[in-house]
From Swiss-Prot:
HAMAP family: HisG_Long (MF_00079)
Keywords of this entry: Amino-acid biosynthesis, ATP-binding, Cytoplasm, Glycosyltransferase, Histidine biosynthesis, Magnesium, Metal-binding, Nucleotide-binding, Transferase
Pathway: Amino-acid biosynthesis; L-histidine biosynthesis; L-histidine from 5-phospho-alpha-D-ribose 1-diphosphate: step 1/9
Its EC number(s): 2.4.2.17
Family annotation (Pfam families): HisG, HisG_C
Protein name: ATP phosphoribosyltransferase
Superkingdom per UniProt: Bacteria
Cofactor: Mg(2+)
One Gene Ontology MF term: magnesium ion binding
Length: 303
């Protein structure tokens, strides 16, 4: 039976309690071999096989928990992290943390948008206009960098309705596909910030056992991300075309070359390629003389 008593020597990790980022974090931990007892009704979860404790909180609470040293690690969108950091610095508060790694999920962009019928050439068209946003500090920094004065209107939700409701002339909000903007009669005109999820650590040094566990997790995360970006490729190649075929497949290391039974003119080539393999690449391999081309996904990888 798993011991779920809170222990001071557990590595404490703060994650978003619900939403797409929460799901992606759960998948990442599973891929890293961390077995978590998830319970949607509980805000604290525990690992079965490692001394890890998960705190499930609001996403905008995670930076503060890291800044204040309440938790050891956190996974958060860079947009939320940057907004909270700018807010604290604006209040003359000290902000310290370590950004360990950008992750390969949580992609989004913070963009300016206006009514689809508005004439827009550049950000200076928004001079002295009211802009609704949930990210006032990121917006202010961008506008200051471009030397544009504006009026900020803070909204914590439903930012897209601000122009049609007469609340603001423009908005600054997160965009993924742009479908929500289009549904509300808006058009995206400028991207002010691009974001992914990232892994952060509190600034204060961890005790050696916790730091060793962090290092282990980092190694596993790196392996998971490299595996997602790589493919294991097997093919047959004429010996005289090896150099040309190898050049089409940039790999982690040199390819493995194996002899083929009863065939002295060709060899089998195995390689882990870091580039995404598209149909065009496979067609180029075939044109170069390769045959029996097999492309396989990689679940885990460690150099």
């Amino acid at each position: 039976m798993t011991n779920t008593t809170m222990q001071p020597n557990r590595l404490r990790i703060a994650l978003q309690k619900k939403g797409r980022l929460s799901q992606d974090c759960a998948i990442l931990l599973k891929q890293c071999g961390v077995k978590i007892n998830w319970n949607e009704q509980r805000l604290i979860a525990y690992a079965e096989n490692l001394p890890i404790e998960i705190l499930r909180v609001r996403d905008d609470d995670i930076p503060g928990l890291i800044f204040d040293g309440v938790v050891d690690l956190g996974i958060i969108g860079e947009n939320v992290l940057e907004e909270e950091e700018l807010g604290r610095r604006a209040a003359n508060e000290t902000v310290t943390y370590k950004k360990l790694r950008q992750l390969d999920f949580g992609d989004c962009r913070l963009s300016l948008a206006v009514d689809r019928d508005c004439h827009y050439e550049n950000v200076k068209d928004l001079a002295n206009r009211r802009i609704a946003t949930s990210y006032p500090h990121l917006l202010k920094r961008y506008m200051n960098e471009n030397g544009v004065s504006f009026k900020s209107c803070l909204l914590n939700g439903s930012v897209e309705v601000a122009p049609s409701a007469g609340i603001a002339y423009a908005i600054c909000d997160l965009v993924s596909s742009g479908a929500t903007l289009e549904a509300n009669g808006l058009k995206e005109v400028d991207v002010i910030y691009r974001s992914k999820a990232c892994l952060i650590q509190r600034a204060e040094p961890l005790e050696s056992t916790k730091q060793a566990l962090v290092d282990k997790l980092l190694t596993r995360i790196q392996g998971v991300q490299q595996a997602a970006e790589s493919k294991y490729i097997m093919l047959h190649a004429p010996k005289e075309k090896l150099e040309k075929i190898t050049a089409l497949l940039p790999g982690v290391e040199n390819p493995t070359i194996l002899p083929l039974a009863s065939d002295t003119t060709r060899v089998a080539m195995h390689v882990v390629s870091q580039e995404n393999l598209f149909w065009e690449t496979m067609e180029q391999l075939k044109e170069a003389g390769a045959s029996s081309i097999l492309v396989l996904p990689i679940e885990k990888m460690m150099e």
